[in-house]
Amino acid sequence: RTHAMGVDEIRETVQAFADAAERADRAGFGAVQLHAAHGYLIHQFLSPLTNTRTDEYGGDFEGRTRFLKEVVAAVREVWPADKVLGIRISGSDWVEGGWSIEETVRLAQELQGQVHWFDLSSAGIGDTYEGPQGPGYQVPLATAVKEGTEGIVVSAVGSLTGAEEVAAVVDEDRADAVCVGRAALANPNWPTAAALALDVPSEQVPMARQYFRAKW
């Protein structure tokens, strides 16, 4: 049965994030990403649609972002400063009264200097989806955060599958990077195919070692 987390449970969970980051460091990972999107726990604290708490972890912006900020602080205690710490966040719930892009930009500004990377997705909370759809539909969220911050790498995601459209997002300075999911699942050699499609010099094309001799 679901229930609102008690303060002791919140503190235990914050520590669990830190413990996981410490294990990732020992395992040799060079980056970790906190998942604050798609209706998962951190997102549930951020969104007014799910966070109806009346204590210090609910209510206004400061209360609803407190859990994430405590997680970031705890992870930073154990995660090496020379390794990447990122956050994937739903930039908007796309539902009236939900978490908004304005709040996302404000949060990113407050976390400048504490995280290296913001990865902008959207939605995941609410019974309906009222947002846009189609290739690049979430890119404006990344652009808003990029324009509102300094010193943070901002990546865009969502229905970006073609080499030209991915390159355009970066070339036009709408985001610093693009995360490709479904296209990479369909073709694990997507980076190579994209580089060839964009006429990248062959010596710069990323190539799996087993394909090197054939150059494909």
Give the location of each predicted region.
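Flavin-dependent oxidoreductase catalytic cores
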Residues: 1-216
